């Protein structure tokens, strides 16, 4: 399955509120084609050294493309940051619920244990979705840059991925990995407690 179709399928399955924050892969593909068309052929902007930023910056269509790419990147990165922070808060809420349920001095209804277990499962699922969001967007930026290089004859992908993408929080997300491990442990702890 082509990446664009795969991405559309994943977006369809994800939280609808996240829709605007995914990379707009289709739009960026169109921009590449417009960049090539505007510059008068796939190799016109690549008449100098193919990865020299000075040569690339002289081509207006290239400047527009990379400005749009950075806008997409900022949008995705900002959303990931706020979602990751929200996950930290949500984990603490589920953890606090577990501690309250363990407290024998507090009265609990018969469904409290089941609700807490369901909350833990929902939280885990949401963190997995956020990890998937990070991975799919990273792949999207990589693919769009490879496509750009193929169509324009430039060699910008590797440099952009190393110098720009690697600085973004969603490209390496240790906090998400830690949250997944913590929630797995919490789930086991909840399952193991006396009802």
Predicted regions and their residues:
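Phospho-regulated, Ser/Thr/Pro-rich intrinsically disordered or coiled-coil terminal scaffolds
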Residues: 1-150, 155, 160-161, 166-170, ...
């Amino acid at each position: 399955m082509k990446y664009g179709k795969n991405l559309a399928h994943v977006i369809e399955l994800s939280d609808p509120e996240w829709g605007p924050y995914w990379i707009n892969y289709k739009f960026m593909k169109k921009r590449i084609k417009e960049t090539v068309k505007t510059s008068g052929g796939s190799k016109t902007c690549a008449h100098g050294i193919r990865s020299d930023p000075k040569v690339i910056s002289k081509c207006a269509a290239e400047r527009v493309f990379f400005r749009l790419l950075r806008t997409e990147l900022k949008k995705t990165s900002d959303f990931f940051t706020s979602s990751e922070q929200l996950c930290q808060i949500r984990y603490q809420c589920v953890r606090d619920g577990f501690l309250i349920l363990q407290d024998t001095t507090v009265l609990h209804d018969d469904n409290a244990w089941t609700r807490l277990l369901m909350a833990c499962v929902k939280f885990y699922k949401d963190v997995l979705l956020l990890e998937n969001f990070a991975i799919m967007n990273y792949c999207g930026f990589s693919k769009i840059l490879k496509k750009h290089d193929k169509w324009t004859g430039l060699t910008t992908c590797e440099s952009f991925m190393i110098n720009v993408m690697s600085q973004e929080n969603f490209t390496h997300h240790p906090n998400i990995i830690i949250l997944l491990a913590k929630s797995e442990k919490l789930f086991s702890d909840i399952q193991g407690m006396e009802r």
